[in-house]
Amino acid sequence: MTTVILIGVLGAIISAVVGTLWYSGATPMGKWHMQYLGFDKLSEEEKAQKIAEAKPRMWKNYSAQLLLSFITAFFIGFVTSYTVQNGGPASAVYYYVVMIWVAFTAPIIGQNILWGTSEDGLAWKRFVSDSASNLVTLLLIAFVATMMI
């Protein structure tokens, strides 16, 4: 169980790193992210004001995201451990992760975008970016789990 908890902690860190890199201003996905947040239409002063307004609550947002990422990574570690204990290959977790992404993650992201406020031109970009980010994160966590179990 200690290994599964460690996978959860490492997975939360992996998720934070992937998200930071994925949505940085240096990537196309980061530029799309700023567009659908409306930051591309703001002046530098307005951007600075929005960032200053958000700073006091950012620790809560990041803490909540780390907890959610821990839960996801813990589940991947648990499934990998359970599979190996029952005679299955650890690599089966890659299949599980892709199927979880196809069956749950991508549809939920799609629903949020479909019923959300994304502009038509950005909706598909947002769907591709957000769902691909999740898939990359899940596969990296699965890789760590297969190396540790």
Pin down the residues of each PLM region.
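Juxtamembrane/disordered regions of integral membrane proteins
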Residues: 1-149
